[in-house]
Amino acid sequence: MDFLLNIIPAAITIATVFLLGSTGETLMEKTGHLNLGIPGIMCFGTVGGCLGVRLVLVMYGTNPENANYFLLVLFALIGCSLLSALAGLIYSFLTVSLKCNQNVTGLALTTFGGGFADYFMSLINKDGFADASNIINTPLPFASSLGIFGKLVLNYNIFVYLAIAIAITVSFVLKRTRVGLSFRAIGENPQTADAVGINISKLKYISILIGSMIAGLAGVFYVMCFVGGSYENSSTIQSFGWLSLALVIFTVWKPDLAILGSFLFGFLFILPNTIEVSFVVMKVLDLLPYLVTIIVLIITSISGKKSVQPPSALGLAYFREDR
């Protein structure tokens, strides 16, 4: 029981990074854009969120431990959203307006995002970030009074519940709303969508910008909520970005399934650090998220069911004259 009480909260916390990244990517892929720039966008989100936190800490001078919880969360969200949207705007301009190759553009954005984060995070004064992290990580006020249930389900910061709410909302929008139907139509057959009057470029821009803002939250969450406000380099954040891309495939492009899938990825990520195993076994366990993703990809490809396949126009630029 003690083992579960320790590993489940840690798995849920790191699962939030995967969930935010995969939800943002799924929204983009539903409109036909395979954005391999997700790791870079998460780096942009990290810088923006940390700048927001820094602005709040400046207000409190030498007493960062007294910083206001609401302001820290709000400024982190605003800063993260702005820079993540900027990264998404760069990607969408290149791939939607200029019709650049999506894979090349995404990889370039990931490389640029890593360098961008490493440079600007080295300039940001991180004094007080540990205090800000402690404040942001404040769990729900009544969690401690509900025993095991409170510790396993309610003992998390607001970002965890925000990530779940975002995933559920995106799933609902894609399945149950007119704009979601338009998104899916663009991803499956943009020629037909264009023929019935759907504004392809406009909706692609919207999905990419919103998806980027969601994915960017994963970066600032990792720094401020998982590693206590510290930052060494962008490589770890980018590794979570690649795992988020794998999670999209693992959960067959369904944000609601990503809630459970992200917990599994989080559990597999935490497991090697909580049990005593050899170095070789630890590395094998690190590979498991990728291995299970490959297995799922093989199974879905063999099954041939449309409901578990990627959007038909995924990764393809749309040229109206080809209609």
Predicted features, each with a name:
Residues 21, 46-50, 114-118, 160-172, ...:
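Hydrophobic core segments of alpha-helical transmembrane domains in multi-pass membrane transport
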Residues 103, 131-135, 155-161, 204, ...:
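Loop-to-transmembrane alpha-helix initiation sites
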